[in-house]
Design a protein with these regions (language model features):
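A structural signal for short hydrophobic beta-strand segments in well-ordered beta-sheet cores
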Residues: 139-142
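Glycine-rich beta->alpha junctions and the first turn(s) of the following alpha-helix
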Residues: 3-5, 195-292, 365, 381
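Internal helix-loop-helix
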Residues: 50-117, 159-165, 290, 304-312, ...
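C-terminal helix-coil-helix/basic helical segment that borders enzyme active sites and/or dimer interfaces
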Residues: 28-35, 264, 268-273, 277, ...
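A short core secondary-structure module
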Residues: 146-147, 151-196
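Glycine-rich phosphate/cofactor-binding loops in nucleotide/flavin-utilizing enzymes
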Residues: 2, 70, 74-75, 93, ...
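Hydrophobic, small-residue-rich alpha-helical packing segments that form membrane-like cores
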Residues: 130-133, 148
Length: 392
């Protein structure tokens, strides 16, 4: 494992930094803040697609640049630092599943549109009674001629308001044991009659949705992979999602740089905050945690280039990185004091309120893609060889 950037990675980082600097004007940044929909968001995504960035790590035969995962990580890091909105679920989780396990027909239809920034997915997994124990999901899909009729409801269907399709897990065999063997993945057109959603507002201001399926008819040809083979797709998709969620840790570096600048410029009790031993200790711990996360991210990217991500390490990385962001935000809020807790638009808000906003937003990442408790179970089972158990 090479822990320093190669010349190619350094060149890519410089290119991306310059590109994002011109793409993300202050007006576009404000219009797309926390918004995974709307005209400006779609305009930015299409521009990214037109310029060839959305399929950076895909094989060339599917319209990608064929770059390794390490260079794709460079892309995500620079995008996070520049606050570029990305259709993360679509390009980083659904598309890799289609490339690895999708039919030729699905690849031909979906991948070019995803690469162009013209088609977006939402994920339909979690239900009110099936989150951590996803295999117990109740949403049903019953064969009727050439279609399946889907009934049920989902929760935490993020980006449903902007999605063209939903990557939906539904039960196609009610009797099989164990129950995860009776699940299939459907690609549901969001314009299909009977599909609807209502918004859920989270503490961080990020929108999610509850979604509903009332006799939604989906062609049998829109099953991804094999009938009753959805669990393999789910686990593959979640491993990619966990890797991607881990990569958001680079957000902490931008906040650290701004917090350090604030501490250098702010005087309390006749001394700059940065000269206070307690502030130095807190900022040093932030740096240490973020640097550890960065190295783990690069190991994960290296694993992806070597094959499928190790489920134990992917789970460990996801748990560590999402909890690490909360921890470092708390430390930086201690350094900034009361001013750090003021919201955006408030007079005297440190970092223009961005630190406070990020602290609220990053909470959701601890359970998106699998709650931290389950991540630890997976580490114990696949990494330490311990016996798995049912939470029922």
């Amino acid at each position: 494992m090479h822990v320093d950037h190669t010349d190619s990675q350094k060149a890519l980082r410089r290119e991306l930094r310059a590109y994002f600097s011109s793409l993300m004007t202050p007006e576009i940044r404000e219009a797309t803040r926390g918004n995974e929909g709307g005209a400006t968001y779609k305009q930015v995504i299409r521009q990214l697609g037109k310029d060839g960035w959305l399929a950076l790590g895909w094989p060339k035969e599917y319209g990608g640049q064929g770059r390794p995962s390490t260079e794709q990580l460079v892309f995500f890091e620079e995008a996070q630092l520049a606050e570029v909105p990305l259709p993360f679920v679509t390009i980083s989780t659904v598309a890799p599943c289609l490339i690895a396990l999708g039919s030729d027909e699905h690849k031909r239809f979906f991948l070019p549109k995803i690469a162009a920034g013209e088609l977006h997915f939402a994920i339909g997994y979690t239900e009110p009674g099936a989150g951590t124990d996803l295999a117990s999901l109740k949403t049903s899909a019953v064969r009727d001629g050439n279609d399946y009729v889907i009934n049920g409801n989902k929760i935490w269907t993020s980006s449903a308001e902007a999605a063209d399709y939903v990557w939906l897990a539904a039960r196609t065999d009610q009797d099989v044991k164990p129950p995860h063997k009776g699940i299939s993945i459907f690609m549901v057109d969001a314009k299909t009659p009977g599909f609807s959603f209502t918004p859920i507002r989270t503490v961080g201001g990020v929108r999610s949705n509850a979604s509903y399926y009332d006799n939604v008819r989906v062609p049998a040809s829109m099953i991804a992979g094999e009938l009753n083979g959805g669990w393999k797709l789910i686990t593959s998709q979640l491993n990619h999602e966990r890797v991607g969620l881990a990569a958001i840790g680079v957000q902490g570096w931008g906040l650290l740089a701004r917090t350090l600048k604030w501490a250098q410029d702010t005087v309390v009790g006749g001394k700059r905050v940065v000269e206070q031993p307690w502030a130095q200790s807190a900022l040093a711990e932030v740096y240490t945690r973020l640097e550890a996360m960065r190295l783990m991210n690069w190991r994960m990217a290296w694993q992806l280039d070597s094959g499928e991500p190790d489920p134990a390490f992917a789970s460990a990385m996801k748990a560590y990185s999402t909890e690490c962001l909360i921890a470092v935000d708390k430390l930086m809020l201690e350094v900034t004091g009361m001013a750090g807790g003021y919201r955006r638009g408030s007079p005297g808000a440190a970092l223009a309120g961005d630190l406070e906003e990020h602290y609220r937003k990053c909470q959701i990442n601890t359970f998106g893609g699998g709650v931290a408790e389950v991540m630890r179970d997976l580490v114990a089972q696949f990494g330490l060889g311990m016996t798995g158990y049912s939470r029922r």
